Amino acid sequence: MFAKAVAVSLLTLASAQVFAADCKVTVDSTDQMSFNTKAIEIDKSCKTFTVELTHSGNLPKNVMGHNLVISKEADMQPIATDGLSAGIDKDYLKEGDDRVIAHTKVIGAGEKDSVTFDVSKLKADEKYGFFCSFPGHISMMKGTVTLK
Protein backbone atom coordinates (compact mmCIF):
# COMPACT_ATOMS: atom_id res chain seq x y z
CA MET A 1 0.00 0.00 0.00
CA PHE A 2 2.80 2.40 0.95
CA ALA A 3 4.62 1.63 -2.32
CA LYS A 4 1.47 2.45 -4.32
CA ALA A 5 1.07 5.76 -2.49
CA VAL A 6 4.71 6.67 -3.17
CA ALA A 7 4.37 5.69 -6.84
CA VAL A 8 1.20 7.77 -7.27
CA SER A 9 2.84 10.73 -5.53
CA LEU A 10 5.90 10.52 -7.76
CA LEU A 11 3.78 10.30 -10.91
CA THR A 12 1.72 13.30 -9.81
CA LEU A 13 4.88 15.29 -9.11
CA ALA A 14 6.43 14.28 -12.43
CA SER A 15 3.33 15.28 -14.41
CA ALA A 16 3.22 18.64 -12.64
CA GLN A 17 6.80 19.24 -13.80
CA VAL A 18 5.85 18.40 -17.40
CA PHE A 19 3.03 20.95 -17.44
CA ALA A 20 4.90 23.71 -15.57
CA ALA A 21 5.35 26.90 -17.59
CA ASP A 22 8.69 27.37 -19.31
CA CYS A 23 9.79 30.80 -18.15
CA LYS A 24 12.87 31.00 -20.39
CA VAL A 25 13.64 31.21 -24.09
CA THR A 26 16.86 31.11 -26.09
CA VAL A 27 17.00 33.27 -29.21
CA ASP A 28 19.85 32.91 -31.70
CA SER A 29 21.18 35.73 -33.88
CA THR A 30 23.29 35.43 -37.04
CA ASP A 31 25.59 37.33 -39.39
CA GLN A 32 22.60 37.57 -41.77
CA MET A 33 20.87 40.09 -39.47
CA SER A 34 18.25 37.66 -38.24
CA PHE A 35 16.83 36.11 -35.11
CA ASN A 36 15.77 32.46 -35.26
CA THR A 37 12.25 33.40 -34.10
CA LYS A 38 9.72 36.14 -34.76
CA ALA A 39 7.69 35.51 -31.60
CA ILE A 40 8.31 35.12 -27.88
CA GLU A 41 5.41 33.82 -25.78
CA ILE A 42 5.42 34.35 -22.02
CA ASP A 43 3.08 32.38 -19.79
CA LYS A 44 1.12 34.54 -17.33
CA SER A 45 2.06 32.12 -14.55
CA CYS A 46 5.74 33.11 -14.83
CA LYS A 47 6.87 35.52 -12.10
CA THR A 48 10.09 36.24 -13.99
CA PHE A 49 11.14 35.46 -17.55
CA THR A 50 14.64 34.96 -18.92
CA VAL A 51 15.76 35.60 -22.48
CA GLU A 52 19.11 34.17 -23.49
CA LEU A 53 20.61 35.61 -26.67
CA THR A 54 23.26 33.70 -28.60
CA HIS A 55 25.24 34.74 -31.69
CA SER A 56 26.04 31.83 -34.01
CA GLY A 57 27.74 33.98 -36.64
CA ASN A 58 31.44 34.66 -37.26
CA LEU A 59 31.64 38.46 -37.18
CA PRO A 60 32.69 40.54 -34.15
CA LYS A 61 30.24 42.76 -32.30
CA ASN A 62 31.59 46.03 -33.74
CA VAL A 63 30.76 44.76 -37.26
CA MET A 64 27.65 42.58 -36.76
CA GLY A 65 26.74 42.86 -33.10
CA HIS A 66 23.27 42.03 -31.84
CA ASN A 67 21.27 42.57 -28.70
CA LEU A 68 17.66 41.89 -27.82
CA VAL A 69 15.50 44.70 -26.46
CA ILE A 70 11.93 44.25 -25.19
CA SER A 71 9.51 47.18 -25.16
CA LYS A 72 6.00 48.18 -26.16
CA GLU A 73 5.63 47.82 -29.94
CA ALA A 74 4.94 51.54 -30.30
CA ASP A 75 8.24 52.37 -28.56
CA MET A 76 10.51 50.10 -30.60
CA GLN A 77 11.57 52.48 -33.39
CA PRO A 78 11.84 55.55 -31.11
CA ILE A 79 14.08 53.58 -28.71
CA ALA A 80 16.30 52.44 -31.60
CA THR A 81 16.52 55.97 -33.01
CA ASP A 82 17.29 57.55 -29.63
CA GLY A 83 19.94 54.90 -28.93
CA LEU A 84 22.02 55.53 -32.05
CA SER A 85 24.09 58.24 -30.38
CA ALA A 86 24.68 56.11 -27.26
CA GLY A 87 27.14 53.90 -29.13
CA ILE A 88 28.14 50.29 -28.83
CA ASP A 89 29.54 50.68 -25.29
CA LYS A 90 26.01 51.48 -24.09
CA ASP A 91 24.40 48.81 -26.29
CA TYR A 92 22.93 51.50 -28.56
CA LEU A 93 20.40 52.39 -25.87
CA LYS A 94 19.86 55.78 -24.30
CA GLU A 95 20.92 55.59 -20.66
CA GLY A 96 17.98 55.30 -18.27
CA ASP A 97 15.40 54.85 -21.04
CA ASP A 98 12.38 53.65 -19.06
CA ARG A 99 10.59 52.58 -22.26
CA VAL A 100 12.97 49.60 -22.28
CA ILE A 101 11.47 46.70 -20.33
CA ALA A 102 14.56 44.50 -20.62
CA HIS A 103 17.64 44.14 -22.82
CA THR A 104 20.74 42.07 -23.30
CA LYS A 105 24.12 43.60 -24.03
CA VAL A 106 25.40 43.73 -27.62
CA ILE A 107 27.24 40.49 -28.40
CA GLY A 108 29.38 39.21 -31.28
CA ALA A 109 30.25 35.84 -32.78
CA GLY A 110 30.22 32.95 -30.33
CA GLU A 111 29.03 35.07 -27.42
CA LYS A 112 25.85 34.90 -25.37
CA ASP A 113 24.08 37.06 -22.81
CA SER A 114 20.83 36.81 -20.90
CA VAL A 115 18.40 39.06 -19.11
CA THR A 116 15.72 38.20 -16.56
CA PHE A 117 12.83 40.55 -15.94
CA ASP A 118 9.69 40.75 -13.84
CA VAL A 119 6.67 39.60 -15.89
CA SER A 120 4.41 41.96 -13.90
CA LYS A 121 5.88 44.76 -16.08
CA LEU A 122 3.76 43.38 -18.94
CA LYS A 123 0.03 44.06 -19.27
CA ALA A 124 -2.32 41.66 -21.08
CA ASP A 125 -3.97 44.43 -23.14
CA GLU A 126 -0.69 45.95 -24.44
CA LYS A 127 1.31 44.97 -27.54
CA TYR A 128 5.00 44.23 -26.97
CA GLY A 129 7.89 43.45 -29.23
CA PHE A 130 11.58 42.68 -29.31
CA PHE A 131 14.29 44.02 -31.59
CA CYS A 132 18.01 44.54 -32.09
CA SER A 133 19.11 48.14 -31.46
CA PHE A 134 22.40 47.88 -33.43
CA PRO A 135 22.17 50.62 -36.12
CA GLY A 136 19.98 49.55 -39.03
CA HIS A 137 19.12 46.12 -37.64
CA ILE A 138 15.58 46.84 -36.41
CA SER A 139 14.25 46.68 -39.98
CA MET A 140 14.96 42.92 -40.13
CA MET A 141 15.52 41.90 -36.52
CA LYS A 142 12.24 42.23 -34.68
CA GLY A 143 9.34 40.17 -33.44
CA THR A 144 6.39 40.07 -31.07
CA VAL A 145 6.24 39.38 -27.35
CA THR A 146 2.93 37.94 -26.18
CA LEU A 147 1.69 37.43 -22.64
CA LYS A 148 -0.51 34.32 -22.78
From Swiss-Prot:
Molecular function GO terms recorded: copper ion binding; electron transfer activity
Keyword Transport tagged: yes
InterPro entries: Azurin, BlueCu_1, Cu-binding_ET, Cupredoxin
Subcellular location: Periplasm
Residue pairs linked by disulfide bridges in the UniProt entry: C23-C46
Residues annotated as binding Cu cation: H66, C132, H137, M141
Presence of keyword Disulfide bond: yes
Quaternary structure and partners: Monomer with an intramolecular disulfide bond but can also exist a dimer with an intermolecular disulfide bond.
Function: Transfers electrons from cytochrome c551 to cytochrome oxidase.
Record-given protein name: Azurin
